[in-house]
């Protein structure tokens, strides 16, 4: 597949912004090039390419540094990809609801036509339906979410989809660290049209730091670096992230605690009469079907406990994030009180 042919013409011809300091190699020097204040704690612009962080990520993920892009959250990753590949009012995006709502929001911002094919009853890709659709339409990009938000399950037939789709494919793996399914990272060399998006917001506990990752072939990464804003990851956030990357064992321990808490929550929810279904999950949340999602959601707010009402996407469902054990015990206690009032 010729990836270059999928790049928008204006992006191909883009001359990216280059700071004077990008020509300087080293850490020490008298910097009089960027009109910075010579005083202050964070008076210098951060490394626009986050080289130290990418080196650590490359070691952790076992992937070359030139295959890595860092964005201001995964939303920037997705937005940059749309700006590289999708021509406004001309190209189209294929998504598979129920899924993460920002895909549609970003497509609308970028004036991109959206095609939707619903996941099947098991929340898997309906390959035959997709195949029939692709006989008549050819979206330029597709986004798959695995594990999927809000359903929680991993998509089992991604390879089958890649065999029939001729375009750019983004696999959103925001929740992959909680899954028994392996990341698609090891298959990148086989699929030059695939970009994998991951995040530090979930398993790494750094949602407030706002750093997302993209992994792709170097051609795509080069275009992403050209299109992004020059200093998209602030220096304090780079420092926090680098410190966290120095201690991946701590993250693994926290993931294990979350998985144990997830098992606890599922076992307790199974005892509640009005919980009609607990969907299988590979994420740090559980989707449940209840008798009256709107009523239960409002009752929980009184305690106050905030869950996510997904009734608009999947009838009578609530998405519950796996919190601390003490928080989940409080949730179960109040749920039992709601049970008495139903």
For the regions a protein language model found, what residue spans apply to each?
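Short hydrophobic/aromatic beta-strand micro-patches
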Residues: 215, 287-289, 321-323
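PLP-dependent enzyme catalytic core of the Aspartate aminotransferase-like
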Residues: 302-303, 314-342
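PLP-dependent aminotransferase class I/II
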Residues: 193-271, 277-278
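PLP-dependent aminotransferase-like
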Residues: 51, 87-144
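Phosphate-binding glycine-rich loop
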Residues: 54-92, 110
């Amino acid at each position: 597949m010729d990836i270059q042919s999928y790049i928008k013409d204006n992006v191909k011809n883009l001359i990216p912004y280059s700071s004077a300091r990008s020509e300087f190699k080293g850490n020490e020097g008298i910097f009089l090039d960027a009109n910075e204040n010579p005083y202050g704690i964070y008076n210098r612009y951060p490394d626009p390419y986050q080289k130290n962080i990418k080196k650590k990520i490359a070691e952790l993920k076992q992937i070359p540094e030139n295959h890595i892009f860092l964005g201001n959250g995964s939303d920037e990753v997705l937005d940059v990809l749309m700006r590289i590949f999708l021509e406004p009012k001309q190209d189209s995006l294929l998504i598979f609801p129920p899924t993460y709502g920002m895909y549609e929001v970003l497509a609308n911002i970028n004036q991109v036509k959206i095609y939707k094919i619903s996941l099947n009853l098991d929340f898997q890709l309906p390959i035959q339906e997709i195949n029939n659709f692709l006989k008549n339409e050819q979206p330029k990009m597709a986004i798959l979410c695995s594990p999927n938000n809000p359903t929680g399950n991993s998509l089992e037939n991604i390879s089958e989809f890649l065999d029939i789709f001729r375009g750019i494919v983004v696999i959103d793996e925001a929740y992959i660290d909680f899954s028994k399914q392996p990341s698609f990272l090891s298959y990148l060399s086989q699929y030059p049209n695939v970009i994998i998006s991951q995040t530090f917001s979930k398993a790494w506990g750094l949602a407030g730091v706002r750093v997302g990752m993209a992994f792709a072939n170097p051609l795509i990464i080069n275009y992403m670096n050209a299109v992004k804003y020059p200093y998209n990851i602030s220096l304090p956030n780079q420092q926090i992230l680098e410190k966290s990357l120095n201690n991946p064992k701590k993250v693994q321990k926290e993931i294990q605690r979350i998985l144990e808490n997830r098992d606890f929550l599922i076992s307790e929810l199974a005892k509640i009469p009005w919980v009609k279904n607990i969907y299988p999950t590979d994420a740090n949340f559980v989707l449940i079907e209840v008798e009256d999602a709107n009523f239960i959601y409002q009752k929980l707010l009184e305690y106050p406990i905030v869950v996510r009402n997904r009734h608009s996407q999947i009838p009578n469902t609530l998405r519950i994030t796996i919190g601390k054990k003490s928080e989940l015990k409080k949730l179960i206690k109040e749920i039992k009180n709601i049970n008495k009032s139903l």
